[in-house]
Regions:
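Conserved catalytic cores of very large enzyme subunits
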Residues: 98-487, 508, 512-666
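Short, hydrophobic beta-strand segments
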Residues: 6, 48-52, 314, 500-507, ...
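Metallocofactor- and cofactor-centric catalytic cores in central/energy metabolism, strongly enriched
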Residues: 272-275, 504, 689-692
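Charged, amphipathic alpha-helical regulatory modules used
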Residues: 1-110, 485, 689-693
């Protein structure tokens, strides 16, 4: 192949025909810059050290020119050539930043403008959000250097280079490379009760009354979230709040909530005092914060039926020796849900993301009271997740590690798994590209997947070592203070493109033996490696990641490289989100025990409905979920927000019911959390428009 026929890859990723004259001119300029002249013989000798191959990057060619200059002992010329490259590299970086600044300012919204990790959890783009975006490219470089240095020490340069190659070829994706922080955590707040925020860099003591609990809790969530790149879950939140209400108004306060307990001019009842506390906490935490690039913290809470409560908190004692009171907590959980549901008619509140934990027995919700209340809240238009299990200790055992030889562990990286657990790092496998790559190259795709999965585990172990190194140097106070137990944190193997990979293989995406076999074999292989690399202090899980950002990226990158891509955003479910042929029960079955058996890190089913169902219908769907083993789900009905008068309706409408304006927006779940559709990136807005919503007929 002649040099004229070879194509090389430029810095912007585009291919261009190779020109030897451009290389010669660059060398001539380098000679002239030091007062010398390059003869044709000089050029031939220098270029004899350069080997050009198809698809080579321009940077590699320039590296070889440097080597050629040094080999021929033109040291001054080589130095000049290197400095020239460095200056131009700096100029390009500044130019890239300027181009990004202009594009970001002109973008439809912050999510569309973000180049690296678009998310809808930003209401409006502004200077603060721009400042947060600009350094992300450098954070990616730094994170890759830190990780590859560790990989070289642990496994050698070959594996380190392979990791970068798989990253750049989009076979794998490192989530949250733009942050140095570990991913998410479901914290225990017990250290806060004992020592306040002092152990993590604050200056406050622990809460002593209801007011200090509310203010201190807000500060705690902000502080913890600033040290995480993902979600912060506080599963003890309402239990602690119930404790402080009881200390102030008596353990049985909930029996007489209308009692006037405020002697101020407001004359507030106990109920009003409590809902004022709700308001203070929820509205404060929903505000954007500078430590999170001017977005709200991603805050999650849990509700429990009596059986889950007794399993997780049965032996819990507050510092004063008292046990948590279930009766008061049960009332407070219901009161918070009712209040939060009503409050969302006033303003589109995103957080907390709520998860209801229910125990099942004989394919029924065991706690009838809480099963009925769950159905009631869904029927009243409230939007929350439900986690169901036929073993109350299964959630407590694996997430709190009471039983360290447990084969399987459940922990969802949105932070809904339990107390003092979470995910340290997420590394995602693009199943669609990996499988198509193997098939196109005549390889058994399961064998190739095994290679990728093995590498992913080694990379995660390298990340874990770096995290331990940071902790040893005092950089992770959340671990040192006991808010998070590093031994209970998971290294998460994410998956994306599973449905698209199955489609490529000619498998129908519905409940059929071929699809079951494909899912079980693929996810079972990951679980096999999770168990292989697991130790008493190092845990792995597998999650079908929400993929708000990377689902769009994978589809774009794979299509550009000639792979079969059936849609513009890869699914985060076991079914095709726009498929109209599947009913609600079909989707629950596709997220049931046959499919999620090996998915220990979560796969939240979002059941998109056009309208709310009745309490009886939701109760029946809870039974169906229990029968099918569909353990994690929510119902998603878009709420209508009028841009003209501000009215919010829990219904999916085409015009405002108050002023009849058609200038409306919708509040729906982009992935795990609810935001205005107008806050979604443009790609995700297009995906949202393709979703199929079931109608109650």
């Amino acid at each position: 192949m002649s040099s004229a026929e070879i194509t090389i890859i430029k810095r912007d990723g585009k291919r261009k025909g190779f020109s030897v004259e451009k290389i010669k001119n660059a060398i001539r300029k380098a000679f002239l810059s030091v007062g010398a002249f390059a003869t044709e013989e000089d050029l031939v000798n220098i270029l004899s050290h350069v080997r050009i191959t198809e698809g080579m990057h321009v940077e590699e060619i320039q590296n070889q020119v440097e080597i050629g200059l040094m080999a021929e002992q033109y040291f001054a010329v080589a130095k000049s050539f290197m400095l020239y490259r460095q200056r131009h590299s700096e100029d390009r970086e500044v130019r890239d930043h300027l181009d990004f600044l202009i594009q970001y300012c002109q973008a439809e919204n912050a999510a569309t403008g973000s180049k690296y990790d678009a998310n809808a959890n930003i209401e409006k783009k502004n200077l603060a959000t721009l400042i947060g975006e600009l350094p992300k490219k450098n954070f990616i470089r730094l994170n890759r250097r830190i990780l590859t240095d560790r990989l070289k020490k642990m496994y050698g340069k070959e594996l380190s280079d392979k990791y970068i190659r798989l990253l750049k070829n989009h076979h794998i994706y490192k989530n949250d490379e733009t942050s140095l922080a570990n991913y998410c955590a479901s914290i225990t707040m017990y250290p806060w009760l004992l020592e306040g925020t002092k152990p993590i860099g604050g200056n406050s003591i622990g809460p002593t009354n209801l007011k200090s609990f509310c203010g201190g809790f807000i500060n705690l969530v902000f502080m913890v979230s600033s040290m995480l790149s993902g979600a912060c879950a506080t599963p003890e939140f309402l239990m602690y709040m119930n404790h402080f209400i009881g200390k102030e108004y008596g353990k049985d306060y909930w029996k007489n909530p209308d009692f006037q307990a405020d002697n101020s001019i407001k004359k507030r009842t106990i109920d009003k005092i409590i809902t004022d506390c709700f308001e203070q906490i929820v509205y404060s935490i929903n505000q954007p914060t500078g430590a999170r690039n001017f977005q709200a913290v991603f805050w999650n809470i849990s509700y429990y039926d009596k059986h889950y409560f007794e399993s997780i908190f049965g032996e819990f004692r507050f510092p004063d020796g008292s046990a948590p009171d279930w009766d008061g907590l049960s009332w407070l959980q219901k009161r918070f849900m009712k209040w939060f549901n009503a409050e969302r008619l006033k303003t589109p509140l995103t957080f907390p993301v709520e998860t209801m934990a229910l125990l099942t027995e004989n394919n029924e919700v065991k706690d009838k009271e809480w099963g009925d209340f769950t159905a009631e809240m869904y029927s009243e238009g409230h939007s929350f997740f439900t986690y169901m299990s036929d073993n109350a200790d299964s959630l407590a055992s694996c997430c709190r590690l009471r039983n360290e030889i447990q084969d399987n562990g459940f922990s969802y990286t949105l932070g809904a798994g339990g107390v003092s657990t979470g995910s340290k790092s997420v590394l995602t496998i693009n199943l669609n590209r990996c499988i198509q790559y193997a098939v196109k190259n005549g390889r058994d795709y399961m064998t190739y997947l095994a290679e990728v999965i093995d590498l992913v585990h080694k990379v995660q172990l390298a990340y874990d070592e770096n995290l331990k190194s940071l902790q040893a140097q005092g950089m992770l106070p959340l671990f040192d203070a006991g808010f998070i137990n590093i031994g209970r944190q998971y290294l998460t193997v994410g998956i994306n493109g599973l449905v698209e990979a199955a489609e490529f293989l000619g498998i129908e995406i519905n409940d059929n033996p071929q699809y079951v076999e494909f899912v079980q074999n693929t996810l079972g292989l990951i679980e096999e490696y999770n168990k292989k690399y697991r130790t008493k202090t190092t845990l792995f899980n597998c999650e079908m990641i929400p993929a708000e950002n990377v689902g769009v990226k994978h589809a774009k990158w794979d299509r550009e490289d000639g792979y079969a891509v059936p849609r513009d955003c890869y699914n985060s479910y076991f079914y095709i989100v726009e498929d109209k042929s599947l009913n609600i029960i079909d989707k629950m079955r596709l997220h049931g025990r046959k499919y999620i058996e090996h998915l220990t890190g979560g796969s939240a089913l979002h059941l998109n409905l056009e309208e709310h169902l009745s309490k009886a219908q939701y109760a029946q769907l809870l039974r169906v979920a229990a029968q099918e083993g569909c353990n994690y789900f929510t119902f998603n009905i878009p709420n209508t927000i009028c841009n003209k008068c501000g009215h919010i309706s829990k219904h999916y409408l085409r015009e405002c019911p108050e002023c009849h304006s058609t200038d409306i927006d919708y509040l729906t779940r982009i992935i795990g959390y609810m935001k205005r559709v107008s806050n979604f990136s443009m790609a995700r807005q297009e995906e949202a428009a393709r979703r199929f919503y079931h109608r109650d007929r």
